Amino acid sequence: MARIAGVDLPREKRVEIALTYIYGIGLTRAKEVLARTGVNPDTRVKNLSETEQSALREAIEKTYKVEGDLRSEVGQNIKRLMDIGAYRGLRHRRGLPVRGQRTKTNARTRKGPRKTVAGKKKATRK
């Protein structure tokens, strides 16, 4: 099993698709890496030679920030926005959409399930 950047790549998938299992590498970057290393994108992970695996591993680790490093950088960026009191930081802190979306309706993904408030109770007749 090929292990690149601490991620076990699925053996039955094409290398091009398997590389996208690494956080920080999408389809475009996967194609770039394969072109740079000269590995055929249609090769299955189980058919990769040891030299191809090491070439891919080296190319990814030297060129891109992936997995834990990238996750921590993103987290630090958000923390910095919150610390300096930027508007985007406030939105993160309150758990609301950050990029200007409407919140009167929608935004349920970011806000979570509705917190229902009891309506007015009907007066009882005497």
UniProtKB/Swiss-Prot annotation:
Keyword Ribosomal protein: yes
Region of interest (Disordered), residue spans: 92-126
GO cellular component: cytosol; small ribosomal subunit
InterPro entries per UniProt: Rbsml_uS13_C, Ribosomal_uS13, Ribosomal_uS13-like_H2TH, Ribosomal_uS13_bac-type, Ribosomal_uS13_CS
Top-level taxon of the source organism: Bacteria
Oligomeric and partner information: Part of the 30S ribosomal subunit. Forms a loose heterodimer with protein S19. Forms two bridges to the 50S subunit in the 70S ribosome.
Name of the molecule in the record: Small ribosomal subunit protein uS13
Source organism of this protein record: Deinococcus geothermalis (strain DSM 11300 / CIP 105573 / AG-3a)
